[in-house]
Amino acid sequence: MSALTIFTESEATTPVWYSMDAAEMAEKLGSKGVRFERWQADRDLGDNPDPETVIGAYQHAIDRLVAEKGYQSWDVISMRADNPQKEALRSKFLSEHTHGEDEVRFFVEGAGLFCLHLDGHIFQVLCEKNDLISVPAGTPHWFDMGSSPHFTAIRIFDNQEGWIAKFTGDPIADGYPRLP
């Protein structure tokens, strides 16, 4: 189940706030400019849907977001435990970084942990099926897909070139809980 855990940036073992309630999560994250919402497909996706089927099932929600925010492109990414690059990709995503654009992800299946470094706190957002998160441009963050990743997500971009990271060099991510 989706969850938000908040730590101070100086204490990585004891949370100062925790909730699994989507409305509470959306309110707490929204106060920091982070969008969190739940989407539903407009059809059954079946087993192992292709990217076109995934996009089609959520096109209504994508169109609403594009109309509101002016995003330019979207795609589907899937990661599985048998991916030969999983360790290198996990390591890269675990380094704190920022983007010059919003990082928008919608989880079609599976899970991932977004960790946001905001105002002296670390907001760990466990995103699961039907969760959308939009991390504002310039927000220091990292992402953990776990040691045996399993997720499919829709990525939505401001920039036609897609995901461009600027790594901060801050090792803070090393001290916080990760997915198994």
Swiss-Prot record:
SUPFAM superfamilies linked to this entry: RmlC-like cupins
UniProt GO MF annotations: acireductone dioxygenase (Ni2+-requiring) activity; acireductone dioxygenase [iron(II)-requiring] activity; iron ion binding; nickel cation binding
CDD domains attached to this UniProt entry: cupin_ARD (cd02232)
Top enzyme category: oxidoreductase
Co-factor requirement: Fe(2+); Ni(2+)
A GO BP entry: L-methionine salvage from methylthioadenosine
Site (Important to generate the dianion): 105
Site for May play a role in transmitting local conformational changes, residues: 102
Pathway assigned to this chain's UniProt record: Amino-acid biosynthesis; L-methionine biosynthesis via salvage pathway; L-methionine from S-methyl-5-thio-alpha-D-ribose 1-phosphate: step 5/6
InterPro entries reported for this sequence: ARD, ARD_bac, RmlC-like_jellyroll, RmlC_Cupin_sf
Site description May play a role in metal incorporation in vivo, residues in chain: 96
UniProt KW Plastid keyword: no
Catalytic reaction equation(s): 1,2-dihydroxy-5-(methylsulfanyl)pent-1-en-3-one + O2 = 3-(methylsulfanyl)propanoate + CO + formate + 2 H(+); 1,2-dihydroxy-5-(methylsulfanyl)pent-1-en-3-one + O2 = 4-methylsulfanyl-2-oxobutanoate + formate + 2 H(+)
UniProt KW keywords: Amino-acid biosynthesis, Dioxygenase, Iron, Metal-binding, Methionine biosynthesis, Nickel, Oxidoreductase
Job of this protein: Catalyzes 2 different reactions between oxygen and the acireductone 1,2-dihydroxy-3-keto-5-methylthiopentene (DHK-MTPene) depending upon the metal bound in the active site. Fe-containing acireductone dioxygenase (Fe-ARD) produces formate and 2-keto-4-methylthiobutyrate (KMTB), the alpha-ketoacid precursor of methionine in the methionine recycle pathway. Ni-containing acireductone dioxygenase (Ni-ARD) produces methylthiopropionate, carbon monoxide and formate, and does not lie on the methionine recycle pathway.
This protein's name: Acireductone dioxygenase
Organism: Erwinia tasmaniensis (strain DSM 17950 / CFBP 7177 / CIP 109463 / NCPPB 4357 / Et1/99)
Gene name for this UniProt entry: mtnD
